[in-house]
Amino acid sequence: MRRFYRGIFIVWVALRYGLDELVLTSFQKPWLRVVARIVSIGRNLDAPRGQRLREALERLGPIFVKFGQVLSTRRDLLPPDIADELAFLQDRVPPFPSAVAIATIERAFRRPVGDVFVQFDETPIASASIAQVHFATIRTDEGEVREVAVKVLRPSMRGVIEKDLALMAMMAGWVEKLSPDGKRLKPREVVGEFDKYLHDELDLVREAANAAQLRRNMASLELVLIPEMFWDFCHPEVIVMERMNGVPIAQLDRLRAAGVDIPKLARDGVTIFFTQVFRDGFFHADMHPGNIQVSLAPETFGRYISLDFGIIGTLTESDKEYLAQNFVAFFRRDYKRVAELHLESGWVPEGTRIDELEGAIRTVCEPYFDRPLKEISLGMVLMRLFQTSRRFHVEIQPQLVLLQKTLLNIEGLGRQLDPELDLWHTAKPFLEKWMVDQIGPKKLFQQLKAEAPRYAKLLPELPRLLHDFLENRPADHRRELLELLAAQKRTNRLLQTIIYGGIGFVLGLLAMQLLVRVRLF
């Protein structure tokens, strides 16, 4: 019954804020268009549609606010005005009672809170839709007393989330069935992505593991501090981490008064991000100002402090290769190659004309080359490409959308700190090394070495599969045959590249020696 009433409330809010015009007006059935006109009688719909959608999500509560935040990153699906407005959604939720937080801690560790902590501050210092944070002190196994931050999951969140997700999935199914435009927006896919995102955030141990990985990765950089996790005090509903003392990065006057080099801070932020993306393929994907502080402690003065590791982006080797080749093609203004990469990735529907896709990409990218490099926003280039992709129904991978969103955040933060920030100058060393690592001879040798055992096992099967294929039994073996042919093609390409590269290197050495001898004589 509660689910029924919740569904009625959601429909009422949607009608109240005029969200029916986003859906009902695209229905093909005439009677549904009549319904759209009827329900819009007597309402003031002067506000832009993006603003009305944002206000409706805020009215529906924190889970829908979270959904809007995730939806704002899908610029490959949403019109720009709606995506821009959803980016303003803020996760503001009143704290839950400290007695409930203490009960959660005692249930997680099966002992009184006084036995878990030396001291526990009952007043929360931060609160969001998923969890809230308290300060405390603990005694380690070595007898050392440490100041910590305790993150406690909001009670009954799982039940609330499951109910709202079920309603979202049901409504997404309706939209896909009744609206052609709605089906193109892939509502069920978006809700499924949100489902995974929320369940990841509900497991606080996962967040602790993300923080531990980032801390290891960033240890040698000495530009950013990641809190240490105390694993003996971590549970899916409670995690305990090192307390970080810093100044919020938005408080620029305090930072300047303390003597922090603000332009260097801007460059360091870009360096941190590109290191995480290009070197590690594991990046903090929620780097808005609320999650960033700056240390004023003498031994770590001016370093970033990262907080909240619930959203992490990862890039596979395939993702890196795709990005590397796109960057090369982009700077060569080879838009046909960019279009081919989209087709080769399998993200473009069959039948897409490559010349049309190439023309659309050229329209997006070409205007940027008339600007100084420091004025080019890589995040905006990616965003425009994703928006163009909507016309061709390109399936942009979630991790690349997350990368684009984070890159926009970093660029915005960097230029807020230093309007003269030259993003490309700061990023150039990382890009150059990354290109060498991704498409240089060392990478080719690594690929050949890694894949040689697999090819050695598969290639002897090729004659048999080819014979079976020619004997009119393609259904059973077509997939395996194509896989082997592709493997053989990759192997040949690697070998040719290595051989030609080696020959070129030797010829280059001989030419240099010849030139030296000519000069000597």
Curated annotation (Swiss-Prot):
Keywords from the UniProt entry: ATP-binding, Cell inner membrane, Cell membrane, Kinase, Membrane, Nucleotide-binding, Transferase, Transmembrane, Transmembrane helix, Ubiquinone biosynthesis
Q: Which residues cross the membrane?
A: 496-516
Q: Which GO terms describe its biological process?
A: regulation of ubiquinone biosynthetic process; ubiquinone biosynthetic process
Instruction: List the InterPro entries hit by this protein, alphabetically.
Output: ABC1_dom (IPR004147), Kinase-like_dom_sf (IPR011009), UbiB (IPR010232), UbiB_bact (IPR045308), UbiB_kinase (IPR050154)
Q: What is its EC number?
A: 2.7.-.-
Location(s) in or outside the cell: Cell inner membrane
Question: Principal localization?
Answer: membrane
Q: Which GO terms describe its molecular function?
A: ATP binding; protein kinase activity
One GO cellular component term, please give it. Answer: plasma membrane
Q: In which pathway does it act?
A: Cofactor biosynthesis; ubiquinone biosynthesis [regulation]
Q: Give the membrane topology.
A: Single-pass membrane protein
The organism's superkingdom is given as Bacteria
**Catalytic-site annotation from UniProt:** D286
**Domain Protein kinase positions:** 119-497
Q: Where does ATP bind?
A: I125, A126, S127, A128, S129, I130, A131, Q132, V133, K151
Q: Which family does this protein fall into?
A: Belongs to the ABC1 family. UbiB subfamily.
The free-text function statement in the UniProt record for this protein reads: Is probably a protein kinase regulator of UbiI activity which is involved in aerobic coenzyme Q (ubiquinone) biosynthesis.
NCBIfam families tied to this protein: PRK04750.1 (NF003404), UbiB (TIGR01982)
Q: What is this protein called?
A: Probable protein kinase UbiB
* Origin species: Variovorax paradoxus (strain S110)
